[in-house]
């Protein structure tokens, strides 16, 4: 992680939105989750992806400075992202420009489908498939289980939300016994495993962190374009990390007190409030080699179930 020095003096204000930004920055720094490279990826995917995918280095530096991240940390993070194949750099005269690499395009789009989905719940009648392996599950199979959205519920038992004739190839285990059921009783043990897989503890913490942010947005005047962009970037940075790890499950298996649906709805509501002013900041400040950013494409309006 690049060393980050927060410069929060400019944020001290009675403005509740500025206070919300400062509070979240402090919390992320305290938990060692304020990663410059992750913030940059969040901004590039969330804000720049729908608007052509390319932005100037100066635009990125301006936003990161508002988030207390110095130029040196940004340069270090960009160098790391470029070396790892996440970002492509180009120059036009004296100006540098960044874009997410085409090699990670499908990864980014796949992530977006989970981050901005209207729900992480599958229909209640989604098939529940039990796969009982004849042998201990290898590390490769365990990774495949996570990748396809399945769940290990016993040492050699996998729960997969798929009909038998559509079982992912990686889970078609030789010698395995397969049992398909339209319903499955959620006992204590399974409930606890599902709670872990749905990131219940961290989702609850995120809900508690952003309820005051939502209240501040409802009570205060509209945030400045710069603060709206900064808060949007921070929130998606935090939400993205959890949304990509939440297991999508049939609605009939979800605990009544599962906090994820409420948290997703809260994030969607805040996002909608921030969208207008944050896009105005991009209109006024973000540049490409051709000038201003192009208008957003259709996928921006479809996020969180929009129309």
Where are the predicted features?
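C-terminal regulatory/effector modules of DNA-binding transcriptional regulators
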Residues: 195-307
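Short, Lys/Arg-rich nucleic-acid/phosphate-binding segment
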Residues: 91-97
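Mid-protein regulatory/catalytic core that forms ligand/cofactor-binding pockets
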Residues: 135-227
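Short, amphipathic alpha-helical interaction segments positioned at domain boundaries
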Residues: 105-126
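Short alpha-helical segments that sit at the start of domains
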Residues: 15-43, 105
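Short acidic, hydrophobic short linear motifs in intrinsically disordered regions
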Residues: 51-63
